[in-house]
């Protein structure tokens, strides 16, 4: 659906030019929710404007459904923009327009007739759960309600793609969860492809299918969220499910960092490990969650004394284990079994 190919973006000319994106590559499939994550200054907003066709890349291409849109004329670019809806951080509603009038704005610009506009606005406000707020002004709405109006407005022209630029930033956790649930529902009901620009790990973990990490304008990690969560060497995976506490254990205990690596990990694997090794197993810390209906987790365990089969046993149950040695070096289950 969306392909970003070797995109570079510079602002300014000659010796004064500043490169804010460098050779960016990633793709988003139809119906996927993709997150682009990074700290302030990473280039996220510039990338979102390029995907939204509000900026042209200095180099590289943007493809929508296989069509290269980065080199289109301004007229054709305006037509293509109708296929992309954008949700902004502060909802960007017009203060002197009611919720319904804000949602109607893109339809007015597109020349849609009054009766058709009214029907479409009513439909959209109902879809985002604000049918009873149609005549209220932005100042009369909560932050979450204003963002829902912004989402309804972004859907006015029936786009195929939604680009959300920090749409949940500044919202409280409960409101954030409700907005993300709404976006997931819209994806499922309308077949939308959604790109989430965010700096929040929780947003990625809750709704994203794939994620791309930007740092100083470069891609440093990219892939399906569940695969990164299950990769014991993924920095993003550790950030999404952190479990690296400074833990003290008994002198004879051997510590293992364990990462879930498959859909078939037994729920009682700790009990099974204790029985198979004849050792006492302690859980020192951990996080286990369902991500997109699939298990993901990172757990630190202690094993009472040495046992040569711990690594192999963990692997047989779909787990990646990293033994933490006394000198703070570590070896994976594959190394331990070699």
UniProtKB/Swiss-Prot annotation:
SMART domains noted in UniProt: AAA (SM00382)
Chief localisation class: membrane
Residues bound to ATP: 38-45
Keywords for this protein: Amino-acid transport, ATP-binding, Cell membrane, Membrane, Nucleotide-binding, Translocase, Transport
Its membrane topology: Peripheral membrane protein
Protein name: Methionine import ATP-binding protein MetN 1
Cellular compartment(s): Cell membrane
Record-stated family: Belongs to the ABC transporter superfamily. Methionine importer (TC 3.A.1.24) family.
InterPro entries attached to this UniProt entry: AAA+_ATPase, ABC_transporter-like_ATP-bd, ABC_transporter-like_CS, MetN_ABC_transporter-like, P-loop_NTPase
Its biological purpose: Part of the ABC transporter complex MetNIQ involved in methionine import. Responsible for energy coupling to the transport system.
Residues of the ABC transporter domain: 2-241
Signal peptide: none
Lineage: Bacteria, Bacillati, Actinomycetota, Actinomycetes, Mycobacteriales
Membrane-spanning intervals of the chain: none
């Amino acid at each position: 659906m969306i392909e970003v190919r070797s995109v570079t973006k510079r602002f300014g000319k000659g010796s004064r030019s500043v490169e804010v994106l460098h050779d960016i590559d990633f793709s988003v499939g139809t119906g996927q929710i993709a997150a682009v994550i990074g700290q302030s200054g990473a280039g996220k907003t510039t990338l979102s404007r390029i995907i939204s066709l509000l900026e042209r890349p200095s180099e590289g291409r943007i493809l929508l459904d296989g069509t290269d849109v980065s080199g289109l004329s301004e007229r054709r670019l305006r037509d293509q923009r109708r296929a992309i809806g954008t949700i902004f951080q502060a909802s960007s509603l017009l203060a002197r327009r009611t919720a319904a009038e804000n949602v109607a704005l893109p339809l007015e610009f597109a020349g849609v007739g009054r009766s058709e506009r009214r029907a479409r606005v009513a439909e959209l406000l109902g879809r985002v759960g604000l049918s009873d707020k149609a005549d209220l002004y932005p100042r009369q709405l909560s932050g979450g309600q204003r963002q829902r109006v912004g989402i309804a407005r972004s859907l006015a022209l029936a786009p195929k793609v939604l680009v959300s630029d920090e749409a949940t930033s500044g919202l409280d956790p409960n409101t954030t969860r409700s907005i993300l649930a709404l976006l997931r529902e819209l994806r499922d009901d309308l077949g939308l492809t959604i790109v989430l620009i965010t700096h929040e790990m929780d947003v990625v973990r809750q709704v994203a299918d794939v994620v791309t990490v930007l740092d100083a304008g470069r891609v440093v990690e990219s892939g399906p969220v569940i695969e990164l969560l299950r990769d014991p060497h993924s920095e993003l995976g550790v950030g999404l499910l952190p479990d690296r506490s400074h833990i003290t254990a008994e002198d004879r205990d051997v510590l293992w960092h364990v990462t879930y690596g498959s859909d078939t990990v037994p729920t009682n694997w700790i009990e099974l490990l204790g029985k198979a090794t004849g050792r006492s197993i302690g859980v020192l810390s951990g996080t286990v969650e369902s991500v997109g209906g699939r298990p993901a987790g990172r757990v630190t365990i202690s094993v009472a004394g040495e046992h040569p089969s711990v690594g192999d046993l963990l692997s047989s149950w779909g787990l990646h284990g990293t033994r933490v040695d006394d000198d703070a070096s570590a070896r994976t289950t594959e190394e331990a079994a070699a």
